[in-house]
């Protein structure tokens, strides 16, 4: 039996709690079962050097885990003096995904930074981060509009992310830690509400997989993402 007595293609209970930060322009706490991530969106009136003078904006992300987000304490990466390759990979994925959600040319010369801090990890921290980051991004843009910084909201493309895998020969959606650590195939899918894929990362961990298995995983993931984007829409109103 899977956690939360769910079926193979069912998500864990998903909770999106907006406005959890007093100071950030946009914020949300996202929960995928026992995985909990705090996402804030901050705006700065500057852009990276490659965009200076072009009138375009930028969206980027940072990702990190609290020391006791896992079963045993991990030293803060800031104390180690450098980020791990995993951290850099995940925050780049989050940034790429959120740039696909907004028309950067309509942002003006400003940067929106999504900070994703894992409070508790039980698998799917990167997919939960992306799903929550979209909500935080929209809330931040609404704050900018309310303040008169931007005249209207940029064109937005709702998107979310979910993990999919093959565990014990079965395609499963939204893997928890125990499933993820034993999965034969592990896949992360980022896609829009209307089923267009932003990013697809799949790895044969313990066994090879064919096109039929890939299609089954993608189908299950896209169906789950429709549920996630519906949850986002409900929170955003």
From Swiss-Prot:
Pfam families: RNase_PH, RNase_PH_C. Phosphate binds at residues 86, 124-126. It catalyses: tRNA(n+1) + phosphate = tRNA(n) + a ribonucleoside 5'-diphosphate. PROSITE patterns: RIBONUCLEASE_PH. GO terms for biological process: rRNA catabolic process; rRNA processing; tRNA processing. It is an enzyme of class 2 (transferase). Homohexameric ring arranged as a trimer of dimers. This is Ribonuclease PH. The gene is rph.
């Amino acid at each position: 039996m899977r956690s939360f007595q769910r079926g193979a293609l069912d998500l864990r209970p998903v909770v999106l709690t907006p406005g959890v930060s007093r100071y950030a322009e946009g914020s949300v706490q996202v929960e995928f079962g026992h995985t909990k991530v705090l996402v804030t969106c901050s705006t700065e009136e500057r852009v990276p050097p490659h965009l200076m003078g072009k009138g375009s904006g930028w969206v980027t992300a940072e990702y990190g885990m609290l020391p006791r987000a896992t079963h045993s304490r991990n030293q803060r990466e800031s104390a180690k003096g450098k980020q791990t390759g995993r951290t850099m990979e995940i925050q780049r994925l989050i940034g790429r995904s959120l740039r696909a959600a907004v028309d950067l040319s309509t942002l003006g010369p400003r940067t929106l930074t999504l900070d994703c801090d894992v409070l508790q990890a039980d698998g799917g921290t990167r997919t939960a981060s992306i799903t929550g980051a979209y909500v935080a991004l929209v809330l931040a843009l609404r704050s900018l509009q309310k303040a008169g910084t931007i005249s209207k909201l940029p064109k937005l493309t709702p998107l979310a992310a979910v993990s999919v895998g093959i565990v014990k020969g079965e395609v499963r959606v939204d893997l928890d830690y125990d499933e993820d650590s034993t999965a034969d195939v592990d896949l992360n899918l980022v896609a829009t509400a209307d089923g267009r894929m932003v990013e697809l990362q799949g790895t044969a961990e313990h066994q090879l997989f064919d096109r039929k298995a890939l299609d089954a995983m993608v189908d299950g993931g896209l169906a789950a993402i429709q549920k996630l984007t519906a949850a986002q829409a409900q929170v955003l109103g």
